[in-house]
């Protein structure tokens, strides 16, 4: 039975990946905020890796704020971001190099490593130009993976675009829309205030993205891979699709107010051609199917069949 350490096991991706790995007969060792080790302490990480010598390690832990989260203290946010998004990655890579060289490592990077790219669609060759603390710390983690890869460590990187599931935390716009639809349908609310209806994103379904992670570590060689749907959608489209699925007209309930945004959003769209060619990966649901799955999990009563037109 293969052993996998899942770092960030309590988050959306960690929970979904752990379920997937167990379904494939893995022994999963979860590492989260409450232990069993402190990932910012290199000695703790080294001891865990040396003891388990796992087949795979998935580095999914992250410090991230959404565009509609309250503004955090910039210095404190930087310290936390670099500790978790960068230094913890180095601790695991170093531990693997020293104590378990056969271990394969996956690092969850982010489309935010591209910052404000010159191209409308990004791939693995797009220059790293992060503009946020989150993006900078994730880009640093990516570069450390490349460095250790050049020294023989099997360190693959998934550059993940926005991906949603019922486990997404409330601060993200997808969760705000879904929760509002359910409350409105139940008569518990009437209006939803969103920061920018024209804001664009490349949204995918999180269970598909953790499947990509497992496939990436199953390849013969380590590399970087964009994981994305490749389709640009607006917040307006997300709201329209969600309300329509519940038999509601979004225009009756949605109000736009830019004041709720804490930072401007940057439209990022990914090209996952390399991933598809290498692994055969394909999204299992389209955009409408994803939105309906989120609503169904939240308890909404749905209408129609939900196919993208």
Regions found by a protein language model. Give the residues of each.
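C-terminal substrate-binding subdomain of Rossmann-fold SDR/epimerase-dehydratase oxidoreductases
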Residues: 8, 18, 181-309
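N-terminal Rossmann NAD(P)H-binding glycine-rich loop of SDR-like oxidoreductase domains
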Residues: 4-23
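Conserved mid-core alpha-helix of short-chain dehydrogenase/reductase
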Residues: 44, 87-95, 208
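Glycine-rich "substrate-gating" loop/helix at the edge of Rossmann-like oxidoreductase active sites
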Residues: 131, 160-172, 196-207, 231
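NAD(P)H-binding glycine-rich loop region in Rossmannoid oxidoreductase-like domains
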Residues: 43-84
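Adenosine-cofactor binding site in Rossmann-like domains, unifying the SAM/SAH pocket
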Residues: 28-44
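Catalytic helix-loop patch of NAD(P)-dependent Rossmann-fold dehydrogenases
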Residues: 73-91, 103-104, 112-159, 164-165
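SDR active-site strand-loop-helix element
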Residues: 7, 31, 57-61, 105-111, ...
């Amino acid at each position: 039975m293969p052993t996998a350490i899942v770092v960030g096991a309590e988050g959306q991706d960690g929970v979904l990946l752990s379920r997937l790995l167990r379904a494939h007969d893995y022994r999963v060792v979860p590492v989260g905020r409450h232990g069993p080790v402190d990932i910012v302490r290199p000695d703790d990480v080294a001891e865990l890796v040396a003891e388990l010598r796992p087949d795979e390690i998935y580095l999914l832990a992250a410090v991230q704020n959404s565009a509609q989260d309250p503004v955090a203290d910039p210095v404190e946010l930087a310290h936390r971001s670099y500790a978790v998004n960068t230094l913890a990655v180095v601790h695991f890579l170093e531990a693997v190099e020293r104590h378990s060289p056969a271990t394969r490592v996956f690092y969850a990077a982010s489309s935010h490593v591209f910052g404000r790219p010159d191209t409308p669609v990004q791939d693995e060759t797009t220059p790293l130009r992060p503009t946020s603390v989150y993006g900078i710390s994730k880009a640093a983690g990516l570069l450390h993976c490349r460095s250790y890869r050049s020294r023989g460590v099997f360190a693959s990187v998934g550059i993940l675009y926005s991906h949603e599931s019922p486990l997404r935390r409330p601060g993200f716009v997808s969760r705000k829309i879904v929760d509002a639809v359910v409350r409105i349908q139940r008569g518990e609310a009437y209006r939803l205030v969103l920061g920018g209806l024209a804001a664009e994103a490349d949204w995918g379904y999180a269970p598909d993205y953790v499947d990509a992670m497992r496939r990436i570590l199953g390849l013969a060689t380590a590399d970087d891979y964009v994981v994305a749907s490749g389709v640009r959608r607006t917040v307006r489209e997300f709201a329209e699709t969600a309300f329509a699925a519940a038999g509601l007209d979004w225009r009756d309930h949605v109000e736009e107010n830019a004041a709720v945004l804490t930072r401007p959003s940057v439209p990022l769209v990914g090209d996952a051609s390399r991933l598809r060619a290498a692994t055969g990966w394909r999204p299992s649901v389209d955009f409408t199917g994803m939105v309906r799955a989120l609503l169904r999990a939240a308890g909404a009563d749905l209408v129609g069949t939900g196919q993208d037109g």
